[in-house]
């Protein structure tokens, strides 16, 4: 008979595997019994972090608390995280939004803030005082004189592409690059640039061709909204 609760050592440390075929009450009973039977095992000494793998199911906050309480009261193990093979509706919705490309043909004027969860394509200008926030990449077919914030939720792999003009500012995750008038002495009306975070954790401004090299997946992006 297959056990519904197992404790195993993995390359990531100690994991408790809870069968997704068993009810929560069965898991609670078997987990309590297993920990009671192993009072003298290596897991009952010094405190150890443990991951709880729950398979193809989701636990409610109450169920996670019940499992956590059993482990806390019957062992020296502390749960670092619960891991599931499935995602909640909210997580799926957020993933879908972040994977989309939003597009708009307009002028972002002073005081306006446009925020999208995925990649963003603007056909138009960003005036001084205007701002774009995107959790993904930002592409502007127009003049940029305002603020472009790509990867605003912490995505340092995001890039910005467009024609940066004074006094524009580029932000990627928590990095900031501000342009001054000296940056534009040799810029022509047709110059397009890319902005990205390099290996040193700094925003770099380079030619538009650089995107294909540093983010090859972007050259194949499709979509729209």
UniProtKB/Swiss-Prot annotation:
Presence of keyword Cell cycle: yes
GO biological processes: cell morphogenesis; division septum assembly; regulation of cell septum assembly
InterPro entries listed in its UniProt record: CAP/MinC_C, MinC, MinC_C_sf, MinC_N_1, Septum_form_inhib_MinC_C
Domain of life: Bacteria
Keyword Cell division included in the entry's annotation: yes
Keywords, alphabetical: Cell cycle, Cell division, Septation
Function: Cell division inhibitor that blocks the formation of polar Z ring septums. Rapidly oscillates between the poles of the cell to destabilize FtsZ filaments that have formed before they mature into polar Z rings. Prevents FtsZ polymerization.
Assembly notes: Interacts with MinD and FtsZ.
UniProt-recorded name of the protein: Probable septum site-determining protein MinC
Organism: Listeria monocytogenes serovar 1/2a (strain ATCC BAA-679 / EGD-e)
Encoding gene (name): minC
């Amino acid at each position: 008979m297959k056990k519904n609760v197992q404790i195993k050592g993995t390359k990531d440390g100690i994991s408790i595997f809870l069968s997704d075929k068993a009810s929560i009450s069965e898991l609670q009973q078997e987990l309590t019994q297993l920990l009671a039977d192993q009072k003298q095992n290596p897991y009952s000494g010094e405190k150890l972090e443990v991951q709880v793998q729950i398979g193809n199911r989701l636990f409610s906050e109450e169920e996670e608390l019940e499992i956590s309480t059993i482990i806390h009261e019957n062992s020296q193990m502390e749960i670092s995280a619960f891991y599931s093979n499935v995602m909640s509706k909210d997580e799926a919705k957020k993933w879908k939004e972040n994977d989309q490309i939003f597009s708009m043909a307009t002028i972002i004027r002073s005081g306006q803030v446009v925020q999208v969860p995925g990649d963003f394509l603007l056909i138009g200008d960003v005036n001084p005082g205007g701002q774009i926030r995107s959790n993904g990449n930002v592409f502007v077919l127009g003049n940029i004189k305002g603020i472009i914030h790509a990867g605003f939720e912490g995505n340092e792999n995001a890039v910005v592409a467009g024609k940066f003009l004074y006094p524009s500012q580029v932000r990627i995750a928590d990095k900031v690059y501000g342009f001054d008038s000296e940056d534009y002495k040799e810029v022509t009306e047709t110059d397009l640039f890319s902005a990205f975070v390099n290996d040193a954790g700094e925003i770099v401004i380079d030619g538009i061709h650089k995107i294909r090299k540093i983010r090859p997946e972007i050259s194949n992006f499709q979509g729209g909204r």
